[in-house]
């Protein structure tokens, strides 16, 4: 799916999502019963995604901070991680001395059930990365996501395909896995 065929608009009227269903019950429940409160309370800004005039997806974004442990940073520096950022030679020591890194969180991403597995989600992630790189409001080095995991569904493989890596070990008592992706990958 070419991302230029998708139309992304700020979600100004939550009622456009009234008939929206991604097929994952917990996510559908949140979209219909919790998203509006999250927007109203400044947790995130939401967007609707159209293919021609058909609503095919929605997503929400919020500013975030990525905390990496020393093992993750070592893997990045050694090139083991695919998320090694491009850094100027003079900035490497400064980068390594940080404990938190500026990020943009994909708070929610859902594709309409009949449009799943068509490349729309991946095109949206690429568009979000472009948006994060082009915005001028704040520094942003990474995308983050709490990838949803339930008994019958896991978003982790999808985000792996999109270039995300876990930044924590899977906790079976938690319904998400925190993952990250660099916005400015180093090309060796």
What do these predicted ranges mean?
Residues 1-37, 41, 46-48:
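Short amphipathic alpha-helix that is part of the acyltransferase structural core
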Residues 125, 151-155, 169-179:
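Short glycine/proline-centered loop/turn elements that form peptide/ligand docking sites
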Residues 138-140, 147-169:
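Conserved active-site alpha-helix within GNAT-family acetyltransferase domains
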Residues 99, 112-123, 151-154:
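Conserved glycine-rich acetyl-CoA-binding loop
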Residues 63-108:
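Conserved acyl-donor/pantetheine-binding loop and adjacent beta-alpha core of acyl/acetyltransferases
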Residues 117-131, 161:
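Conserved acetyl-CoA-binding loop-helix of GNAT-fold acetyltransferases
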